[in-house]
Amino acid sequence: MKNILDMFRFLIWIFQAIYYLRRYHIDIVFCKGGYVALPVVLAAKLLGKPIYVHESDTRPWLVNRIASKFAKHIYTGFSKVLPWAKVVWQLLSDELVVNTDWLEKSSQTNILLMGWSQWAMTLYSAILELLPALESENFHFTVILGKLNTQLKSDFETFSNVEVREFCSQKELWALYMRSDIAITRAGTTSLAEQDLFDLKLIMVPIPRTHDQFANAKRYVEQRDGILLDQDSPDFKAKLLAELLKLKNFKKTITQKDIKTAILEPKKQILSDMIG
């Protein structure tokens, strides 16, 4: 019964999408994926409107696999993801570009720890256990907890080489990327692309049982010399400590890339195809 109801809801969503596409005179539909995008894509197909698809992940999700069959142009953030796709890299926020004059140079190795979600407790707890062994090293940690892990704030603040933040705006995060040398991070495509843009050494700890994050991380191991760790491994903490100690004197080499151009170029390519 539920499947029948879902089918009727889906048909209603398609008709609603047709209504809004006509009402607002939409000429082009751009799809980034997600379940709610599929009715809009199918409505656009029925109305004969051009569809453009961008897939961020190394493994395309179902909606984008379907949408790509109707698309006029297909774009990806990685190679060998979808047939006939143009690789344009990731689509990142323009807010990542801000003034850097105020940033202070540091002789320490700056490590940015980002877990964000409720699934990050294992990652944060592992770092807390390792911090006593790392406090005497030349490390400075910036820990972004996210709103779901604020109970750990006081634990992190007991260490002199740790700065704790509950939340960061996009511009604040950009400044932290600029200052940091290493990121201990999950393996979502947007986060990895942002951190790679700022030349951070990536220690990637994918959310367990998320095959897309493991696939994303493997690409960065192959192409960017990243480090991939499995938090479900029994020796996860020992491996993480060993990797950090190897990098205790690491300072990133900032390339001469124009960050603003790197962010704008994929968008310019897509816009050129749309109006060309």
Each language-model region and where it sits:
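Structural loop-to-beta junction motif characteristic of Rossmann-like glycosyltransferase folds
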Residues: K49-P50, D181-I182, D199-I207, D225
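C-terminal "capping" alpha-helix adjacent to the active site of nucleotide-linked donor transferases
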Residues: E222-K251
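Short His-centered aromatic/hydrophobic patch
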Residues: K32-V36
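Acidic donor-binding loop of glycosyltransferase active sites
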Residues: I26-I28, M178-S191, L200
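Active-site-proximal region of nucleotide-activated glycan assembly enzymes
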Residues: L46-N99, L103
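Donor-nucleotide binding loops and adjacent catalytic segments primarily
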Residues: K105-I182, L192, F214, K218, ...
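C-terminal alpha-helical cap of glycosyltransferases
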Residues: A242-N249, K260-G276
